[in-house]
Amino acid sequence: MNFVGIIAEYDPFHSGHALQLRMLRQRGASTIAVCMSTGVVQRGGVPILPEAVRVRAALAAGADLVVALPAPYANASAEQFAAAGVHLLAALGCDTLAFGAETPEPAPLQAAAAALCSAAFPAALRSQLESGLPFAAARAAAAETLCPGAADLLQTPNNILGIEYCKAILRQGAAMQLLPLPRLGAAHGTAQTGQVQGQALASASHIRQLVHTQGIKAASPFVPQAAMELYRQAAEQGQLADPEKFSTAVLTLLRTKTPEQLSTLRGAGEGLENRLYAAAREAETVNNLYDRLKTKRYPTARLRRLVLDAVLDVPAAGLPALPPYLLVLGAKRSALPLLKHAKIPAGTSLAGLVGQDPKLQIAADMHSKAVDFSLLCRYKIQPMGLAYTAHVVLL
């Protein structure tokens, strides 16, 4: 293990993330690269803090290099999110992929991934769906018929994402070893807190809730001191995400769309565009919109991502299947020479990358549009164009 990659959101970066970086150093990682969601996040929202703040927090805690997981690929299913992250880290030259998991052993996760990628899986899934099971339950049941034990693995969020990483490595033929790490402290997506090595830990979702309800100081017990100082400064400058601005922006933009426009979106079809059109015309808040969209057929997470795709006009066709460039958001200067060995266009300026290769324009513009939208949803609204003008963070 020499060059370790992590796929993360850091929404926000907290003490559990810092502990993970320390664990990787203790296990022998000489260089750690992070592929981080930018503009938007996988749950169909905007990050609580802008990219530069999260990048600085990660570098201060021990990361060597932070590259962008561009917005269209960040707001995506677990499968697409994982595929994009693996592709970028493999292109960067990482030899190991580290991630948190409830089952921190590679073999069971790899076996489940192999079952999901097998030629027999589509028929097994179809059989379970025909029995009336919802998609997630049908998927787990189908996997269980091909790989005993897979259903249990597919019940927990970090294992699910870990299996998607394994699938991506298999399908892409990426030369990366797996390093699943035990998830320590608080469970994903809960209000529980924990303590490891004397450090209080909480999930990112709980920290976000604390900040939204009690202010930035409420995050202090759960984030490194250096990060906390960055977060205080960001809050003073109005850079925190404002849920009310997000809600208003989403509804405003959705109400300008026609059903025909919505039908061309990624993830639309099967009447979802009509359901979204009707819900947007009646909803009073974005949460009310999500409630109106709810259906047994579609997971809430998918509907949230569809809403954001509609806001950003992410098309069903035309976007490259995988990110076509490596955009460095921040780095220690000693890590920059690694870019010379990248297998896809790489650099520290989005404008520079597009200037070198115009074929990158579509993905770059989609990424820029999402960053612009995110800046609209801050307590202090920021100017447009930051994705193309931002300076790389160097330490």
Name each model-derived stretch.
Residues S30, D64, D95:
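Receiver (REC) domain switch/active-site residues of two-component response regulators
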Residues R25, L59, L89-A90:
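Non-catalytic positions within long, well-ordered alpha-helices that form the structural scaffold/packing
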Residues A68-L395:
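Active-site cores that bind ATP or allylic diphosphates and position pyrophosphate for catalysis
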Residues I7-A8, V41-Q42, A58, P72-Y73, ...:
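Short, contiguous strand/loop micro-motifs
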Residues V53-R56, A60, L338-A342:
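Acidic, Ser/Thr-rich peripheral helices and adjacent loops at domain boundaries
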Residues R56-P70:
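A glycine-rich helix N-cap at a beta->alpha junction
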Residues M1-R54:
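N-terminal catalytic cores of NTP/NDP-binding nucleotidyl/phosphoryl-transfer enzymes
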